[in-house]
Amino acid sequence: MTAAELSARAEFARRLARDAGALAQRYFRREIDFVAEAKSPQDFVSAADHAVEAFIRERLQKAFPADAVLGEEGGGALGRNLWVVDPIDGTINFVHGVRYWCIAIGFITAGERRIGVIYDPSLDELFWATKGESAWCDETRIHVSPRDRLDHALVCAGYVPRHPLEEHLALKRRLHEAGVAVKDMGAGALMLAHVAAGRYDAFLEPHMHPWDASAGLLLVEEAGGRIHPYPGPGGLVAGGPVIAAAPGIFAALERLTLAR
């Protein structure tokens, strides 16, 4: 793929994320009524998720018909040039009226993350990165925090019910014993964007799907952060664990997270 082709996709993805966010806001404000259903405990899906993903898919397929699209709600096939889409990351917040959710769009070429866009409609903040071109929030370059001590760190630790609860609680105990302040804001992609912007010092989750993780991981890397290898041995569709942090605490946090 040429630099011009990649640049065109990056610009398109930024516009698309804003447009998708505007549509999602209509549902969030109940200008369009919707019903939410639980796929599993604390894992919600709503008509808003389906509508926003359909909107994104249609725009991508019209603009780049040869590209593949993999979405949280609609699935899809893999391809050399692949878009990964989470139409509303943080659906549990969205359906409860909590303003911590986002639109996440990533682009992967031959297995390499090349574009990441995360839009927070509630604050009208657009986080974006293209491989090798730094990370940005709107027109401002962003960087991970300079934190170098765990006992000064603010870390987000997400949890998914399919992961053993005992392991999650043991990890939180280790983090607290190390002096870490621990939060879970309920939207992994947006938490990754906030790590890239230096607002949080790190983000951990035992498992993330590619549509949740891809855009944010590129943001963190381009903002000077470090990440644990992703995806796991099962490949892209299977996803894997996520550790993303400021470089000054990454090694210590990785050891703490992977300890048993």
Residue ranges of predicted features:
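N-terminal subdomain of lithium-sensitive/metallo-dependent phosphomonoesterases centered on the IMPase/IPPase/PAP
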Residues: M1-I88, R255
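Small-residue (primarily alanine) positions within well-ordered alpha-helices
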Residues: A13, A17-A20, G116, G216, ...
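Residue-level signal for inorganic ion chemistry
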Residues: A24, D49, L60, T91, ...
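Generic detector of well-ordered alpha-helical packing
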Residues: H50, E73, P87-G90, F94, ...
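DPxDG-like acidic metal-binding loop motif
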Residues: E58, G79-W136
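Short loop segments at secondary-structure junctions
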Residues: I108-E112, S122, K131-S134, T140, ...
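An extended, acidic
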Residues: H143-R260
